[in-house]
Design a protein with these regions (language model features):
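Bacterial N-terminal signal peptides that target proteins for export
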Residues: 4-23
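Scaffold/interface architecture of coatomer-like assemblies
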Residues: 31-367
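Hydrophobic h-region of N-terminal signal peptides that target proteins for export
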Residues: 23-31
């Protein structure tokens, strides 16, 4: 059982994430047929067939505290509006984490702060039998450390972070990180922690492709947003632009005023799904100002801002607390004949609780 108190949440026993459902395969599982080699210039693709869907679910009370002790009978899950059967087996699922850090030239004064959090990632995030890899990106995508459970190697890799060019290939870094996570054993949970600005600079891949891959591989994306601290150091804040996410889709913090629209969002039924569908379909050109928000929101993750070493460390702790306080709901979709976007909605049959989970996943239409 997970303890919602901050002090005890990080104990070894609380780092075991609960999984509802027999995990035939981790995340959304796939059968992949051999494919002929593709020309190097093409964007990386993922060939997938959905079998089992896993939906990490965070439950908060009115004060914003994690709610523990729920059972399978407290949850209802809907896939495209159709109720799905959740099985009640409980298992332990160790964590595989990629830490992807923007290492561009404008971060010269900020990287020393980020270099110090390697030990915290091991102590506060990974948990029992956890492993991490470290990736740096500017105009290159560099793997500084492949997956390891060795805290010393993780810390050493973080200390290798150095500023490079002015580019920041955020989308390409997400795609490559998802590929790394997809190769991990099937019994591991997959998480990507981005430490970056909100906007991509010079990626070759598309947001749609990276997001589709993350959802199909059941990768939860969390982010530590460095935009505020960049503005603090450079004195040049980027001009604000309207969010691509409707105002009603914004998260209401614990203790905030609830409205009918915000309550719909917390049950995953808000009106921001159409924008996500347009991203997947690429039916028209859509300007997405904040790619990080799209990655975190639509994979069930969350983003945190920081402006100091202390707030950075608190953000890392908050990520660990959430990951190890979640319920992992698994089910076999019974409606895979419905091609396109499958919206996931989770309800808790107890009053005045806030629920956050992944919004859904994309399924190719069957011939």
């Amino acid at each position: 059982m997970f303890n919602s108190e901050t002090e005890s949440a990080m104990t070894t026993s609380s780092k075991c994430t609960r999984v509802f459902g027999f995990l035939l395969l981790t995340g959304v599982c796939f059968a992949q047929a051999p494919q002929p080699p593709r020309p190097p210039a093409e964007s990386p693709t993922f060939s997938t067939q959905v079998k089992v869907v896993i939906s990490p679910t965070t439950v908060l009370d009115k004060a914003g505290n994690y709610v523990n002790g729920l059972t399978i009978d407290d949850f209802e899950l809907f896939d495209n509006g159709k109720p799905q059967r959740l099985t009640a087996d409980i298992a332990f699922q160790p964590l595989s984490l990629v830490v992807a850090v923007q290492a561009s030239s404008m971060l010269t004064d900020i990287l020393p702060k980020i270099q110090k959090i390697g030990v915290l990632i091991d102590n506060l995030v990974l948990g029992q039998n956890g492993e991490a890899a470290v990736v740096a990106f500017d105009h290159r995508i560099r793997v500084l450390q492949d997956f390891t459970a060795d805290a010393g190697r993780i810390d050493a890799a973080m200390k290798k972070l150095t500023a490079g060019s002015s580019s920041a290939r955020l989308i390409d870094a997400v795609t490559d990180s998802v590929r790394m996570l997809a190769k991990r054993p099937d019994n591991r949970r997959r998480v990507l922690l981005l430490i970056s600005e909100k906007r991509d600079k010079a990626s070759e891949g598309k947001l749609r492709e990276a997001l589709t891959a993350a959802q199909l591989q059941n990768v939860s994306i969390y982010a530590l947003d460095i935009s505020h601290i960049v503005a603090q150091f450079t004195g040049q804040a980027e001009p604000a632009r309207p969010s691509p996410i409707p105002a009603t889709a914004q998260h209401v913090p614990g203790g905030g005023v609830q409205t009918p629209s915000s309550m719909e969002i917390q049950n995953n039924s808000g009106n921001y799904i159409p924008m996500l569908v347009e991203i997947f379909k690429a039916a028209k050109s859509i300007f997405v100002d904040d790619q990080v928000d799209v990655f975190t929101r639509y994979t069930g993750g969350k983003q945190y801002a920081f402006v100091s070493q202390k707030s950075l460390e608190k953000a890392v702790q908050a990520v660990g607390e959430e990951l190890h306080s979640q319920y992992l709901l698994s089910y076999n979709p019974d409606n895979l004949d419905e091609g396109g976007f499958h919206e996931i909605r989770v309800k808790v049959n107890r009053p005045r609780l806030e629920v956050r989970t992944r919004t859904g996943y994309w399924v190719a239409a069957r011939p």
